[in-house]
């Protein structure tokens, strides 16, 4: 197995411990063999750091709009010795990675930011995936609605319900 260490701040989402949704995603994470992946709305970097550690062939991009989250995600990449293959960028949604295509995109999107932003992240992933790329999202509230919307946008939609969350696996 692997051991991970994370520092956080109580002002960040789930700052005192890793939340159930993120745990559900990392316990069920599907990783491509290589290439670029994205952890969008990364917070203090749990998903991206775990992915980087599990597969050293991946180049991991992480984005967040919160400067403290970006700084902390960088610290956590260093702490877990994956900083050589992790890039953490500050910015809104997909803006910091414009023009890049990813083999996989992951997120536990920030419901506190509102459904519009969550919808942009989930439905917008399609435009940022490589030809054989896929996305995995974990959603609490609004999961059923977004699952229905995703079925209009993606050719493959797998939804797993667990502990009040919906884990979505999406392929264009």
Regions found by a protein language model. Give the residues of each.
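Active-site capping/gating segments
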Residues: 143-172
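Short "lid" loop at the C-terminus of a central beta-strand within the Rossmann-like core
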Residues: 111-113, 140-145
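Class I SAM-dependent transferase core
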Residues: 1-32
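General small-molecule cofactor/ligand-binding pocket signal
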Residues: 7, 61, 87-89, 157-160
């Amino acid at each position: 197995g692997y051991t991970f260490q994370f520092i956080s701040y109580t002002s960040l989402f789930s700052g005192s411990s890793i939340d159930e949704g993120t745990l559900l995603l990392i316990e069920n994470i599907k990783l491509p063999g290589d290439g670029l992946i994205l952890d969008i709305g990364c917070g203090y970097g749990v998903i991206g750091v775990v992915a980087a550690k599990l597969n050293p062939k991946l180049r991991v991009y992480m984005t967040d709009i919160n400067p403290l989250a970006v700084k902390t995600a960088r610290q956590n990449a260093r702490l877990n010795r994956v900083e050589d293959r992790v890039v953490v960028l500050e910015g809104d949604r997909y803006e910091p990675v414009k023009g890049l295509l990813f083999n996989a995109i992951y997120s536990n999107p920030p419901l506190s930011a509102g459904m519009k932003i969550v919808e942009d992240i989930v439905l917008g992933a399609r435009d940022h995936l490589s030809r054989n790329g896929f996305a995995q999202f974990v959603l609490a509230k609004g999961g059923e609605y977004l699952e229905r919307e995703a079925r209009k946008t993606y050719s493959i939609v797998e939804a797993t319900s667990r502990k009040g969350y919906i884990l979505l696996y999406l392929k264009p």
